[in-house]
Amino acid sequence: MPTWVRAAPDISPDPTNINMNLSSPQIDAMAERLDDAMRQRRPLEPLTSTHPGIDIDDAYQISLRWLHRREAAGERVIGKKIGVTSKAVQDMLDVHQPDFGFLTDRMELADGASASLSALGLIQPRAEGEIAFMLNKDLQGPGVTHQDVLDATAWVAPCFEIVDSRIRDWQIRIQDTVADNASCGVFVVGTQRTDPAALDLAGVTMRMQRNGQPAGSGRGDAVQGHPAEAVAWLANTLGARGIPFRAGEIILSGSLAPLVPAQAGDRFTMEIDGLGGCSISFVD
């Protein structure tokens, strides 16, 4: 397991920046339904179908209530993630703006892990090849630039994020995926640590294989032109809600290529130029 020291991230929003359409009991009920869907591995109908008035602030509050349930069950927040950052993923999901969520220690697996779909509550997982950022300085938006991100980064590493929607058949709109903690499932960070100043992250290429066969590839500039731009976007988006980045957090910057469905028996490997690689396998 990883050995770096993690901060205790701030996750409580500034209440003056919240404008919700749904009532607090409705938000609690949706968080409970998402939690039950994960634990029972039974996907829900889209929240935007059952509650058409839901907006981004509602969705974000649902994700926080769900996160608080997970913390109450013993999970610990260790970072944040950005999703739907590349055009390829936006086109695939028909969601045309990034989303955001939180990472807990239960979501993190060791490089080369054999992941049990049932034990982890994964329903309809898909693999993403990403670049992970480990922060060694605090960042507070708004006004964070991609250079600020690079200056605050201790190292970058290759990362598999295994996204998973608790929404049936991935029929999501932006409110659905934000409420669903940005469709986060589990993640694996490679063991090679690289100074982000040592190479051009926009120009690197990621190559993914599933069961020894090519499964996808993409460049760093597929993620908002530069992975650090995506991290800056998240710092500013959460900063507007009163939530900073803290030193010791790990940030997943978004997929470099289209998502690849995963099932029991699959083994995924991935390499990124200059950053090394990582792998993950799946069992029932």
Regions found by a protein language model. Name each.
Residues 21-226, 263, 267, 275-284:
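Catalytic-core "active-site belt" of small-molecule-metabolizing enzymes
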Residues 241, 246-249, 266-268, 276-278:
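A short pocket-lining beta-strand/turn micro-motif at the edge of beta-sheets
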Residues 10, 14-19:
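Intrinsic-disorder-associated, low-complexity terminal segments enriched in Asp/Asn/His/Tyr and depleted
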Residues 231-260:
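A conserved acidic, glycine/proline-rich C-terminal tail/linker
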